[in-house]
Amino acid sequence: MKLGLIGKNIQSSQAPDIHKRLGNLFKIPVNYQIFDLKENDKNYFSDQVFRLKDRGFTGVNITFPFKEEVLKYADVINESSLMIKSSNTLIFKTDIIAENTDYTGFLRSYEFHFGKIKPKKTLVLGGGGVGRSITFALGSLEVEHIYLYETDKVKGNILIQDLELFKINCTLIDYNQLKKIISEVHGIVNCTPLGHYDFPGCPLGEFMPSNDHWIFDAVYTPAKTTLLKKGEKVGAKIISGIDLFIFQALDAFLLFSTQRIDKNEISKHIQFLREYYFKVLFK
């Protein structure tokens, strides 16, 4: 099974490792390659997608900054990708099929930590591809209210309008409101690249969370970001992007696999994968 990852600044990605591990667990040979595009060249990106399909790839994962752009090249867009207007997984059959396992992966990550408890007021930092997936996932979890901090006001307002179509309440805030909103919310979710090895920093700037917060960071390289370190320092519940990484990869592998794998069967390996990746990455 030939798979790949297309994105920018992705040399530290663990995607090849986890898909090969899953292949070994289910006795499916996996060849997984990284295609690190150095520029946001949309034409080059589209050429790469069609080239990999022609080369017999089963599918590819898509990451920053192409999760929204990729929908232009899909023949079939699944329901969640259509709703979110973003995709992180392409399946190559006769058609190119767009799926979104960031959405399902966040749902599973949240439920892993909180069960059936509905999210209270939540601050989401960043409204790009993964931000769109997570805000819609929070909506599916019946979040009380979302506060979106997105510096691109046009992008932020488009997301809010899209959420309103599904009766998901969201307010766009600016930096001047950030400190006040942090004090009012229960959850803080980072969907920006800030904190990644190639984008150092903290999306909260100089502001600090408190021990009343739960904090999730979609960045997992490094696994313990500046944001999570801030949360750990004050005693907040911190949730590493490792969980999203694992759950979205499990869902993607099920979609890629040409043999039938029972979801319950793959779920048996969650604890093993969490223990391994937290040991390797969470330092």
Regions found by a protein language model. Name each.
Residues 7, 100, 110, 118-143, ...:
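Glycine-rich adenosine-cofactor-binding loop
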Residues 10-12, 152-154, 222:
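Helix N-cap at the beta1-alpha1 junction of Rossmann-like dinucleotide-binding domains, i.e.
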Residues 58, 62-67, 129-130, 193-196, ...:
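Short glycine-rich anion-binding loops that position phosphate/pyrophosphate groups of nucleotides
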Residues 115-121, 210-211:
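Short helix-loop-beta connector
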Residues 169-239:
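Rossmann-like adenosine-cofactor binding region
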Residues 140-145, 234-236:
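Conserved S-adenosyl-L-methionine
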Residues 218-283:
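Adenosine-phosphate binding glycine-rich loop
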Residues 1-114, 230:
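Phosphate/diphosphate ligand-binding glycine-rich loop within oxidoreductases
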